[in-house]
């Protein structure tokens, strides 16, 4: 089997570390691995698959000779992606920098793999909450046109990176010992006001826009339409940060053009790759972050008719946003390209 020269930009962060875990787990065929990060992390040693790697500072020349560049996200993507493409690498980017660029495919491999072939050097990985939702929407969309979607999310602190996870852990420890918790990260680190996340919910993920939606909510709306290739769908979203370490959950209400039976919906979901149907109310079986953390698949349950609206179903979906919502989805894109001789 051919092996590929791979670079990981942002190798020391949560998504970058997950890339390494998945490369080993999935036996991704690499001949060279270049770990890149900011100047702050340069020189750090990372042990991986029996070898010690030194993290290098990212520069415009960092991608010479690289076949596949996995970008873990962040502001560096916009700066370095053009340099990587110029050097001949294919960039799979986890940031929001290129997602809505009409020249850049926005891809979930189970949903719209055909879009990959149109790339011009960069392929965008969707937002984590978007990926999880469209995994649930696609099997339903294939059996009936969707008219409207209402989604509310319950998003884990790891969506805010290592800092978010550390803050929850520190706050829980402080409260358990009778101390005052310190908030410095959530909802948005760069904003002046921060709130305790331990034993709390924060109805703000990212900054507010002029329409009073947050950027996270608009990402879900805009990205879903692009991935599904359907601008007619009406979508509204409310995104909430919850005191869970890992795995996002979403309550999704879907109105269809025509009636969809529960039997047809269950059959479509159960047959779809990357989804586990965990839906047995009589036995109290339903998806929870506890079940999906560190797993590849997303899980769907609580499937039921909406008693208030015709041709409408409700479902509950959970997925590991660091895996399927980020690193796994990006690696699956690379695997698809290898399998179809696109790299």
What are these regions (language model features)?
Residues 1-197, 232-234, 286-288, 298-299, ...:
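N-terminal Rossmann-like NAD(P) cofactor-binding subdomain of oxidoreductases
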Residues 117-124, 200-211, 315-317:
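Helix-loop-beta segment of a Rossmann-like dinucleotide-binding subdomain
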Residues 123-132, 212-221, 325-329:
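A glycine-rich, Thr/Ser-enriched phosphate-binding loop motif common to dinucleotide/cofactor-binding enzymes
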Residues 159-162, 209-212, 244-248, 262-263:
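Short acidic/glycine-rich loop or secondary-structure boundary segments that cap or lie
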Residues 192-244:
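Oxyanion-binding "anion nests"
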Residues 232-343:
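C-terminal active-site/capping subdomain that shapes the small-molecule cofactor and substrate pocket
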């Amino acid at each position: 089997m051919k092996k590929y020269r791979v670079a990981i930009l942002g190798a020391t962060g949560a998504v970058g570390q997950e890339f390494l875990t998945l490369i080993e787990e999935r036996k991704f065929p690499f001949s060279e691995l270049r770990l890149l990060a900011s100047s702050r992390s340069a020189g750090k040693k990372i042990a991986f698959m029996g070898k010690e790697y030194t993290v290098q500072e990212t520069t415009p020349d960092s991608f010479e000779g690289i076949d596949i560049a996995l970008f873990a996200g962040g502001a560096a993507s916009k700066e370095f992606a053009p340099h990587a493409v110029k050097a001949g690498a294919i960039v799979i980017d986890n940031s929001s920098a290129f997602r809505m660029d009409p020249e850049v495919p926005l891809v979930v491999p189970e949903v719209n793999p055909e879009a990959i072939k149109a790339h011009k050097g960069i392929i965008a990985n969707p937002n984590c909450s978007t990926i999880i939702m469209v995994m649930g929407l696609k099997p339903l969309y294939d059996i009936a046109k969707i008219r409207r979607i209402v989604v509310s999310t319950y998003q884990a602190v790891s969506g805010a990176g290592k800092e978010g996870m550390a803050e929850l852990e520190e706050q829980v420890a402080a409260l358990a010992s009778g101390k005052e918790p310190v908030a410095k990260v959530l909802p948005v680190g760069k904003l002046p006001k921060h709130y305790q996340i331990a034993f709390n919910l924060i109805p703000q993920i990212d900054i507010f826009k002029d329409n009073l939606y947050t950027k996270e909510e608009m990402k879900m709306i805009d990205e879903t339409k692009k991935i599904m290739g359907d601008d007619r769908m009406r979508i509204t979203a409310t995104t909430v940060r919850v005191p869970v370490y890992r795995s996002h959950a979403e309550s999704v209400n879907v109105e269809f053009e025509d009636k969809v039976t529960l039997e047809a919906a269950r059959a479509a979901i159960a047959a779809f790759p990357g989804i586990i149907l965990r839906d047995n109310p009589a036995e109290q079986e339903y998806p929870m972050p506890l079940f999906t953390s560190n797993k590849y698949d997303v899980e769907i349950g609580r499937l039921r008719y909406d008693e208030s609206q015709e041709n409408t179903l409700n479902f509950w979906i959970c997925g590991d946003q660091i895996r399927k919502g980020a690193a796994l989805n990006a690696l699956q894109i690379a695997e698809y390209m290898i399998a179809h001789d696109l790299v």
